[in-house]
């Protein structure tokens, strides 16, 4: 979950929030760059963020780099020593993997469902209608760390795709169809475990990630780590639905997307032009989910009565 909490540069909210989602776009380029954007363990993750901070020029780039650090600190709590990077044994199996194991689903699907709960119960900052990426800064940081970096063209293509999918996920969960899926998951107990996890391991992942963004080397002496187990592989179906929804939103004219470079930053802006059309497409996506047989059995039973 992304949040402005922990941002030391409040006048640069967009830059910080953009940085707080940016590392995941590495996987859009390749699995290898996804790993390099995150770091295999927490020490490498902190080194990546510190390198970016040292190369940043101006408060806008520093805010972006701090957001990048925030993402990595959130991931170390969410992934722990289970599936996903960076790895940090301090946080046990990690919240996302805990949810995946509890419900017998894969890591990516668990995160998708958790995002739905966060949006509906905790709120989600809707300022992601504008995402700004300093491609030159990212390239410099990667070259400094690894001796090479993705080309600026590859970075631009990756962030254009990633931003569209990220906005599509937000749009889906904020649609009637997304609300229906959330309620169905909630009624069957699939997304009702966040508070259980907090109580069981004596650690609030959200609050802890903010603390770590401010003090990356801090640890929790009272944390009770869970044991990591084998997790299912990535469910490409979830990614497929989000990608399809992103494509349909733009092609249908339900949204307009502006992509341009401004002073070394790739700026991607989304504007909802036909909410009714976007909601209708989201409903079709949910129908496809139900038909796929990939949803939890009890959740699918509830939804099958509606569709």
UniProtKB/Swiss-Prot annotation:
Domain of life: Archaea
Protein name per the record: Uncharacterized protein AF_2172
Gene source species: Archaeoglobus fulgidus (strain ATCC 49558 / DSM 4304 / JCM 9628 / NBRC 100126 / VC-16)
């Amino acid at each position: 979950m992304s949040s402005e909490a922990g941002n030391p540069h409040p006048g640069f909210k967009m830059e910080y929030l953009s940085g707080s989602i940016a590392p995941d776009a590495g996987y859009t380029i390749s699995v290898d760059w996804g790993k390099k954007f995150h770091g295999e363990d927490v020490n490498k993750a902190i080194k990546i963020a510190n390198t970016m901070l040292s190369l940043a020029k101006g408060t806008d780039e520093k805010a972006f780099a701090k957001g990048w650090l925030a993402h990595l600190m959130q991931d170390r709590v969410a992934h722990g020593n289970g599936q996903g990077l960076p790895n940090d044994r301090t946080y046990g199996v990690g919240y996302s993997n805990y949810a995946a194991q509890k419900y017998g689903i894969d890591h990516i699907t668990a995160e998708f469902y958790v995002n739905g709960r966060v949006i509906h119960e905790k709120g989600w900052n809707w300022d992601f209608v504008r995402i700004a990426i300093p491609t030159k800064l990212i390239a410099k940081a990667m070259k400094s760390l690894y001796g090479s970096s993705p080309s600026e063209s590859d970075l631009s293509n990756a962030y254009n795709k990633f931003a569209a999918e990220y906005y599509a996920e937000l749009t889906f969960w904020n649609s009637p169809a997304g609300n229906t899926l959330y309620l169905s998951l909630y009624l069957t107990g699939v997304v009702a475990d966040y508070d259980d996890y907090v109580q069981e391991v004596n650690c609030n992942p959200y609050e802890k990630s903010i603390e770590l963004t401010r003090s990356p080397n801090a640890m929790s002496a009272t944390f009770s780590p869970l044991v990591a187990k084998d997790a299912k592989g990535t469910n490409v179906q979830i990614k497929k639905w989000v990608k399809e929804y992103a494509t349909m939103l733009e092609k249908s004219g339900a949204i307009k997307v502006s992509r341009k470079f401004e002073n070394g930053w790739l700026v991607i802006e989304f504007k909802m032009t036909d909410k009714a059309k976007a909601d209708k497409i989201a409903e079709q996506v949910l129908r496809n989910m139900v038909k796929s047989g990939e949803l939890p059995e009890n959740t699918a039973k509830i939804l099958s009565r509606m569709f």
